[in-house]
Amino acid sequence: AEAQRLVTLIGDIIRLSQLDEGEVLPKERLDLLEVAQGAADDLQAEAEKKNVHLSVSGEPAELEGVRQLIYEVAYNLGDNAIKYNVDGGSVSINVSSDGKNAKLTVSDTGIGIAAEDQSRIFERFYRVDKSHSKESGGTGLGLSIVKHAVQYHGGRISMDSAPGKGTSISVSLPIQ
């Protein structure tokens, strides 16, 4: 388990350094719904282990993007929504498009995030609840990767959250 955590950490650091250095990564035409479904499929076992219901809904939304980065966005948002959820809670991933932007929204019934922490959760290694870190695992880089991947694609992130009320994070990506 510790070896796998280190491999994940190294991979996360490499991805962030590529984005920091402005490395040009190859874009392709992809369907955000298909990528989100793939991330959800990969998260299903973790959701079941935590007794969290995970669902994906929406419509196909094509865009020009780096598949691995878009996957990381969906996976990391879904992973956090599961990690910081309550027993018997739910996570819903929804994809939509307005013709100009493809939108991914991950909503959960979890512990929520206080207003004073919301501006910091996308910082590297920042954790709202340090006591929860050991049991939930992770590298502390997932949401930083989300932020950088969204910026790389010229997108925006918005959040609606309150302690005890859950969290909804939306990512809007230009279709180009």
Question: Model-derived features: where do they sit?
Answer:
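Acidic ATP/Mg2+-coordinating residue in the GHKL
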Residues: D108
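Conserved micro-motifs of the catalytic ATP-binding
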Residues: E21-P26, G58, E62-Q68
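Short conserved segment of the HATPase_c
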Residues: I113-R127, K147
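Conserved glycine-rich
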Residues: G154-G155
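Short conserved segments within the C-terminal catalytic ATPase subdomain
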Residues: E46-V56
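Short alpha-helical segment of the dimerization/phosphotransfer core of two-component systems
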Residues: A1-L6
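A conserved beta-strand-to-alpha-helix junction within the catalytic ATP-binding
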Residues: P26-Q44
